[in-house]
Amino acid sequence: MKKRDSRLWFAAALTAMALVLGVRGLYGFCWSDESFYLTFAQRLWNGQKLILDEWHPVQFYSVLFYPILTVYRALFGTRGIYLFARELYVLAAWAASLYLYFTLCREVRPLFAFLCAGLYLSYSRGNIWGPSYYNLFLTFGLLSACLAFRGRCGAGKGRGLRFFLCGLCLAAAVLCVPYFALFVILCLGAALCLRKTRKDALWALGGICLGAAVFLLCFLPKDIGGVLAGLKQILSDPEHDGGPVSYLLAAIRDVKLLYFYEAALALLAGAVLAAGMCFLPKAWGALPGLAVAALGAAASLWRYRAAETGFAFYQLALFCLPGLVLCWVRGQIRIPALLLRLLGVCMGLAMALSSNTEAITFTVGLPVYAIGAVLQLSAVQNEEGKSLRFFAGVLAAAVLCVTFSCRITQVFRDGPLNTLTQTLTDGPAAGLRTTEEHAGQYGQILAMLESLEDTYSSENRIFFTSILPWGYLAADFPCGAPTAWRTKLSSPRLESYYETHLVPAIVVVLKENMGASPDKHDLNENEFSGPFWEELQENYSHIAYPCADVYISPKAILKGA
């Protein structure tokens, strides 16, 4: 009797996971990060320029979403763009997970390929549902690895095309996290030096060059002096003033603080495993060490069961180390698995150099490393292979369950899941469900913006302070601030920015309670001081709304004027 092909069943399981995520994407309304990532493309749509008009360091990946936003705006405006972006990312992640799954099926059993693809699909940095640069960085990094693997296994024209597409994915990943370019250049240079990989590397280089050419010709401003001045301002961003090395060291210190005991347990497991291999029969010599690792992983997963989405990957990475070392000693190294782990390390380091969020930064590269670890342990065929495969499968399944559970139950920048009972019906967040309080605040702000749009021309620039990125999506007014991210009235960057840019005709000072959530009580805390605040007090007229104080410049252009 012919044995059934289980690959389609596991592909169906990935599809079911994606459907659950698609439904979960209806819940929660993030007032800050999620809409902030969309405003980069919105500024391009308004005719503003990268670097010259936007002074935030993570702006470059906006060119990836800009064509999609342009089409969406032409068809629907910005109504419901939050939900559209979320579902679009879930769809893209599902497609990428299937591609990863069928790629890994060439190396390991379908069960392990499913676990690896599920680990990717269940991850989202910060549980942010839209296409953040974190999530896109992970997606393009994994796609480049899959294309390279399929390219090495293929031949003829298809091989070159896959490596060319691999290069395009690497270029997109660099747009998401520019520091990743350091590792791409290093690895590509090494591949070009080896005769065996030179041709493939040249194809990949072609893809990178095409991506770079499109970015330079279509999106980078031609004002070199302005670009250099803008880069100086970007590098002096007050939220990123520590520098890349200090961010990396801070991330390492945070990991040591959080996972010191786990690291000690992993070392103990390695020592027990080594002793078992020396003094016990080979068939079950690895069992005591793996048992210690399994107990340590279980305790740690329980400890961090409600932590940041992705923290469970630390346990997988740490407690797989004894098994990986054993594979190394036995000479059972799988090159694709090793390269995936190296890619994960490079992605984690690039992210740590870019971000000041400490231990969270490494979680972007950890899924790739974890997939490489599971791929290695699940492919061992010697005496210890059965024990290692069982250990890797159980641990990967546990991490998958914890991560997927966090993805479903945790809510970023909104109330608990059971309080998201109000469905928004208008504006950029239409279709999302949020708390009754946030729904009321959202309605007040939309009414305020409608009133302003009825009175003032869309040529006027607007500035929301301290933070309301979705306001720039809801209003027809272009952004009049250095960035849509947290910018207080006292920010010293405002004075520098308005030396070369138009001062906003409309300034919206939000009430401090606007957008507050259990994990961020002071979202719109402000500081009423500095030259810009004094300018508002002296020369702008004031309009009071329930949600904000609005200041109108005497130079504001009336609608129809």
How would you label these PLM feature ranges?
Residues 128-137:
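Short acidic/glycine- and proline-prone juxtamembrane loop motifs at membrane-interface regions
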Residues 95-122:
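Transmembrane-helix signature of polytopic, membrane-embedded enzymes
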Residues 38-42, 53-77, 87, 173:
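Short hydrophobic/aromatic helix or loop-helix immediately within or flanking a transmembrane segment
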Residues 147-172, 198-206, 291, 335-345:
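Short hydrophobic alpha-helices at membrane interfaces in multi-pass membrane enzymes
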Residues 136-155, 162-170, 317-323, 369-372:
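Specific aromatic-rich, kink-prone transmembrane helix
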Residues 153, 182-216, 277-280, 379-383:
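Perimembrane helix-loop-helix junctions
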Residues 125, 147, 160-178, 184-189, ...:
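Membrane-interface alpha helices of multi-pass inner-membrane proteins
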